[in-house]
Curated annotation (Swiss-Prot):
SUPFAM superfamilies: Ribosomal protein S10
GO CC field: ribonucleoprotein complex; ribosome
GO molecular function term, any single one: structural constituent of ribosome
Pfam family, one: Ribosomal_S10
Organism of provenance: Streptomyces avermitilis (strain ATCC 31267 / DSM 46492 / JCM 5070 / NBRC 14893 / NCIMB 12804 / NRRL 8165 / MA-4680)
Subunit composition and interactions: Part of the 30S ribosomal subunit.
Lineage: Bacteria, Bacillati, Actinomycetota, Actinomycetes, Kitasatosporales
Keyword Ribonucleoprotein among record annotations: yes
Gene behind this protein: rpsJ
Family matches, as Gene3D superfamilies: Ribosomal protein S10 domain
Protein name per Swiss-Prot or TrEMBL: Small ribosomal subunit protein uS10
Entry annotated with the keyword Ribosomal protein: yes
HAMAP family per record: Ribosomal_uS10
Biological process, per Gene Ontology: translation
Amino acid sequence: MAGQKIRIRLKAYDHEVIDSSAKKIVETVTRTGASVAGPVPLPTEKNVYCVIKSPHKYKDSREHFEMRTHKRLIDILDPTPKTVDSLMRLDLPAGVDIEIKL
């Protein structure tokens, strides 16, 4: 697998969960002998939803809810077969979305 690169994108609503997951991935990859670039924090996506408080009138009375999606990027340079195997076995929390590109 010489000359290849694995790119991992992590997404989560909680920044503490995503940071601990990124730390776990970096530790696992460095233990197997591959080099790591990252975790790189990507821009946080913020969705704001505006809802009228009352069920049928009083349009001036509104409530705002926001949902933040935190993102991280990790590049693994020159991965070994042992690196790929350890990444497949890695157990991460349920609140983290993982995209792996070879």
